[in-house]
Amino acid sequence: MQPRHPVRLTATLCLLLASLATFAGAQDKPPAVDESLRFAIIGDSGTGSSSQYRVAEKLIASRSSFPYEFVLMMGDNLYGNENPSAYQKKFERPYKLLLDSGIKFYASLGNHDEPNQRFYKPFNMSGERYYTFKPKGNVRVFALDSNYVDQKQLEWLEKELKASGSDWKIAFFHHPVYSSGGRHGSDEMLRAQLEPLFLKYGVDAVFQGHEHFYERIKPQKGIYYFISGGAAKLREGNIQKTDLTAKAFDTGYHFMLIELTKDKLNFQAISDLGKVIDSGSLPRFSDEQKKAFAGDAALPAPKPTATTGRNK
């Protein structure tokens, strides 16, 4: 007996074979990879106080829902004594679970830090006051020493920025070039030294500490600036009303979580009580937009003077 619907069966068989071929071809390709980069930020953290440990607990707990790959330190990593027991109390003990799980910390030097911290292996500074690393293919991170910005550091920074072909260029250091803080405020000399290079070579975001609060600055010439200096120190009520502030928080301690996708910077600032105090998704400015913002970047950065060193 002949099949009742030979044409229909033949068509069905062809579709099935085509589907199997497509599936086999898809299996030859590697699975989709999450190209985003996640990291955390702490600043002015090294006190050994209960506030540092409280922030550290929330930082550790957040990794279960936000699996960050490393932590950037904004300076003032160790206040006061820096003997071996101080390193244990102010760094190794509060962040032990992260260190044991292989999370790397990358430090910058603050005004309360001894330069010899750069030789402490868990800070991953490789013995340098300033350095750069590439955590993922489209991201390059630049750690600077804002305590003393000499011509050698500026020349190094320009060379590294120029050589970087990364889409995302992230800088971090201690002293803020834009700030609404009543104690310190914006470091205009540092801004005059660094901003022309940031503009010329398309830096996307800058993270800083020193001010013991959280502040997200309104975009400045196509660059996003954040102050995150409250991981163990707090200067309550210190933020002044200025036109710089997009969001500010000076009534509690905090840390930050950052995610970089192909074209967005997603962020959260989280208090020591686990409350999200600021969050958002910021678009990466295009190369064309950056070139437009860099109109004044051709001006040479001022050379450092005897007052360039910062110890306040």
Explain the meaning of each model-derived region.
Residues 1-7:
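N-terminal secretory signal peptides that target proteins for export/translocation
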Residues 25-86, 147, 152, 180:
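N-terminal active-site segment of His-dependent metallophosphoesterases
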Residues 31-33, 60, 79-169, 183-205, ...:
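Extended active-site neighborhood of metal-dependent phosphoesterases/phosphodiesterases
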Residues 66, 234-237, 264-268:
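Substrate-binding/catalytic groove segments of enzymes
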Residues 248-312:
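A short C-terminal boundary segment appended to hydrolase-like catalytic domains
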